[in-house]
Amino acid sequence: MAAPVDGSSGGWAARALRRALALTSLTTLALLASLTGLLLSGPAGALPTLGPGWQRQNPDPPVSRTRSLLLDAASGQLRLEDGFHPDAVAWANLTNAIRETGWAYLDLSTNGRYNDSLQAYAAGVVEASVSEELIYMHWMNTVVNYCGPFEYEVGYCEKLKNFLEANLEWMQREMELNPDSPYWHQVRLTLLQLKGLEDSYEGRLTFPTGRFTIKPLGFLLLQISGDLEDLEPALNKTNTKPSLGSGSCSALIKLLPGGHDLLVAHNTWNSYQNMLRIIKKYRLQFREGPQEEYPLVAGNNLVFSSYPGTIFSGDDFYILGSGLVTLETTIGNKNPALWKYVQPQGCVLEWIRNVVANRLALDGATWADVFKRFNSGTYNNQWMIVDYKAFLPNGPSPGSRVLTILEQIPGMVVVADKTAELYKTTYWASYNIPYFETVFNASGLQALVAQYGDWFSYTKNPRAKIFQRDQSLVEDMDAMVRLMRYNDFLHDPLSLCEACNPKPNAENAISARSDLNPANGSYPFQALHQRAHGGIDVKVTSFTLAKYMSMLAASGPTWDQCPPFQWSKSPFHSMLHMGQPDLWMFSPIRVPWD
């Protein structure tokens, strides 16, 4: 049961601010909502303090901004300066083209003359300094009321705060007990980057030399949005976010005719409130371990689709300088008996394991070995690791190493090389249902198949059938984009839901448009209802593009066979969507790093 904040000492402020938020424009909202940090808080004061950038009147970031973090050798003090400085610890540029292309672009580099820890902290600092307005708006659109400030489920929020604090404390102990471990070195760097992001946003620059704290309900919330999907049921949250059957991404890996190329594509399914998007390029200079004799990590250079204030992808889709492309779709867990494996000690949350594996791995097998350590049982996904180093254009199957598949649920991780299957069938499709029978059965999906039918089966799900039917049409990049944006639910028989009224359902497509389902329809489970949810992008790369850390990308809900999504004309026009374009009608672009 949600506990309203009105009963607390800040209740008058909550009521006043709610009335103000209901009546005001988005521009004014940026100013009014800033009061929240002063007047209200959840169990741990979830809303971050506004940074110095909020002295400006315009809440949108400029078209382009570059900032550098410098270290004063004499005083040891860090300071931010506008522009690029070659001696800086780190520097970043944000180019904001959200209203032109649907994307902003972040280009961030660190300086190998400084130690890894300072580089990591500095990376967080400069990212926040160039994107603070977008971070604020994304926070307001997505997590401002998660465990406060207006109302929250007290019991769950206290359990979540305690879980995260215990987990952070356990990781700090492991870092201290294993000072020479490359694994724990990378975990520490990841948390230092998050610390730098939060410190910079709050207007303070204090590099931590020993133990440091991360706010459990601060910017960590932006990193753990995927982990929360499983922490909520594991911690017995009464009102959980995920809808039964809700998809969370489609992916396709396609071997083109004659084996002349291998395309990798992904589209993210998410709430439309999450459509403030940034494609990020990191050029880091981290070493594998804490001593200088360690070599540089394989995955220092990476490009990924992401969100403001998020230091990993979350979609997930990465192009790595190691020659790997890593991506996932969420499979979840529907077996309550497995939640016992979700514990704060002995686990590293998925978002961190993802970052560490991307840095350290040279191939799919080592990626899986790193990732499966300290399985948290949260953000349970099917991961696909494509190794372009093993792919031979126009050549025969190398037999192994091109494609590794990993599936995780609480208490279980299954890994297999699927190169032979990829070359036999010419494609691998992923659509939120486990491939491995042991994972499928253990995660409780058999019961859902028995109750609801083929919609929850691996081979007969609507997306499985559409991929099987249409993957042979993919002969180039443009055709891949078309398939990944495909949604002809009004005319495609594979989009029909026999138990629904009306039967055509916009969820049953490669790129969902659940906003187009009638509000007054009847549906057997929640995912098929009308929702402000669907496919919100597409990203595609190839053997050649990946060499140049590049991709084709389109932002926003598909409009190929459907009308474009427009906030002002949608049933969800009153949902907060600060900083977003009203009309989402963007074509694919090649990401312009130069």
UniProtKB/Swiss-Prot annotation:
Signal peptide range: 1-46
Sorted UniProt keywords: Disulfide bond, Glycoprotein, Hydrolase, Lipid degradation, Lipid metabolism, Lysosome, Signal
Post-translational modification: The p76 protein is synthesized as a 76 kDa precursor which is then processed into a N-terminal 28 kDa form and a C-terminal 40 kDa form. The C-terminal peptide is further processed into a 15 kDa form. Glycosylated; contains mannose 6-phosphate sugars.
Entry's Gene Ontology molecular function annotations: phospholipase activity
Cellular component GO terms, alphabetical: lysosomal lumen; lysosome
Claim: Transcription regulation is one of the keywords in the record: no
EC number(s) recorded for this UniProt protein: 3.1.1.-
Predominant location category: other
GO biological process: lipid catabolic process
Superkingdom: Eukaryota
Tissue expression profile of the protein: Present at highest levels in spleen, lung and brain (at protein level).
Presence of keyword Glycoprotein: yes
Gene3D superfamilies tied to this protein: 3.60.60.20, Phospholipase B-like, domain 1, Phospholipase B-like, domain 2
Subcellular location per the Swiss-Prot or TrEMBL entry: Lysosome lumen
Enzyme class: hydrolase
S-S bonds: 147-157, 497-500
Function: Putative phospholipase.
Subunit and interaction comment: Interacts with IGF2R.
UniProt-recorded name of the protein: Putative phospholipase B-like 2
Gene: Plbd2
